[in-house]
Amino acid sequence: MERGAADIGVVGKDILLEQSSDVYELLDLGMGKCRMAVAGVKGERPDGGHTLRVATKFPNIAREFYRKQSREIDIIELHGSIEIAPILKMSDVIVDIVETGTTLRENNLEVIETVVPISARLIANKVSYKFNNARIRELCDRIAENLEKKD
């Protein structure tokens, strides 16, 4: 998108945050709703006295979240079933997308706090938006009207 391969597109907010994408975020489509959350072993809360070990597929989101809290962290970047990291004592917590929480419960984990709500977003390439503003705005407005009709 950023390199001009497309004028507009749909992407999850998690991807926009993780990649620090240089695009215009035009509209929250309200689809694919979930949340990025910190989760840990049920009933356990990591103490603040040590560097927090965080397993995640989203290292940039996790770093930014804990930077705002002035918390020292050690990122353990994993792909796949990161829910096993706290169980195996590889990490204190995970930062991951949570929709229903079923996978967390199945692994004896629970949400500690929400990092950010996630949903699908309509985005535009900045150059395309500049040169095709009227067409893109018209499309964006029509999509927004249809979304309002659904509510």
Regions found by a protein language model. Give the residues of each.
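Domain-level signature for soluble enzymes in the chorismate/prephenate branch of the shikimate pathway
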Residues: 2-151
